[in-house]
């Protein structure tokens, strides 16, 4: 079974179809914002209801919104710092097959930093000054369910940045590794089961595996 691709038969928005993001006053001045994969209009409304510009806004989206709300999506892209999408979505949004060319086109739409996820083949980070970083995926013997891996990746990425207070490219490189490490746990069991059971020591152990993978020479 190829878990790097999906065939979406139908998308039902259900309660999210008319979701109105109400932000409590105490949360209206965050330093870091993660716009999850909801409609571009919800994402835009969320930003408009903040009373202070965040240090960093990270956004996730998917091909569904490119199909039905492209203009709204482009409006949100103008207001975010980092976009995270997969390789198929990057090609659709940019109209370019080469991911390097796709990154250039997408960054011109607004987000100065772009993350392109490639499933079991890792992730690419394109920086605001033309920098590029590749983080491999950890080879796993068993992959139970990839659902939620992208959300986990994004959470690990921005969570690391928020914990350090940094937004520079070097910090983002480490954030990519944290996101990849957590996502590698997510796919090992269904839902949040695995993530709910791991400890900080488990995360450190997996980070060590990533460092070994990225530095070991033949």
For every predicted segment, state its role:
Residues 23, 73, 143:
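Acidic, amphipathic alpha-helical patches
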Residues 48-56, 64-134:
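Conserved phosphate/ATP/ADP-binding segment of small-molecule kinases
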Residues 32-35, 58-60:
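Short catalytic-loop micro-motif centered on adjacent basic/acidic residues
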Residues 1-34, 49-53, 204-218:
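Conserved N-terminal subdomain of the carbohydrate kinase-like
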Residues 20-21, 44, 66-70, 96-100, ...:
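Structural motif corresponding to alpha-helix initiation and N-cap regions
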Residues 99-218:
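Conserved phosphate-binding/catalytic region of the ribokinase-like
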Residues 37-42, 62-66:
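Short beta->alpha connector loops
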Residues 13-18, 61-67:
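Short gly/ser/thr-rich secondary-structure transition/capping motifs
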């Amino acid at each position: 079974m190829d878990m790097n691709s999906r065939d979406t038969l139908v998308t039902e928005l259900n309660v999210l179809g008319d979701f109105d993001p109400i932000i409590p006053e105490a949360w209206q001045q965050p330093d870091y914002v993660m716009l999850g994969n909801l409609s571009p209009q919800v994402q835009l409304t969320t930003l408009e209801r903040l009373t202070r510009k965040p240090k960093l806004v990270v956004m996730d989206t998917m091909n569904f919104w490119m199909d039905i709300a492209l203009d709204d999506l482009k409006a949100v892209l103008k207001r975010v710092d980092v976009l995270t999408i997969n390789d198929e979505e990057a090609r659709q949004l940019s109209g370019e097959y080469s991911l390097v060319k796709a990154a250039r086109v997408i960054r011109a739409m607004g987000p100065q930093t772009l993350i392109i996820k490639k499933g079991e083949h890792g992730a690419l980070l394109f920086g605001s000054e033309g920098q590029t970083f590749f983080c491999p995926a950890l080879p796993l013997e068993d992959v139970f369910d990839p659902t939620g891996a992208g959300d986990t990746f994004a959470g690990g990425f921005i969570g690391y940045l928020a914990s350090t207070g940094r937004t520079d490219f070097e910090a983002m490189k480490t954030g990519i590794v944290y996101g990849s490490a957590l996502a590698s746990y997510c796919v090992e069991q269904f839902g949040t089961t695995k993530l709910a059971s791991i400890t900080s020591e488990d995360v450190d152990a997996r980070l060590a595996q990533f460092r070994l993978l990225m530095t070991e020479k033949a």
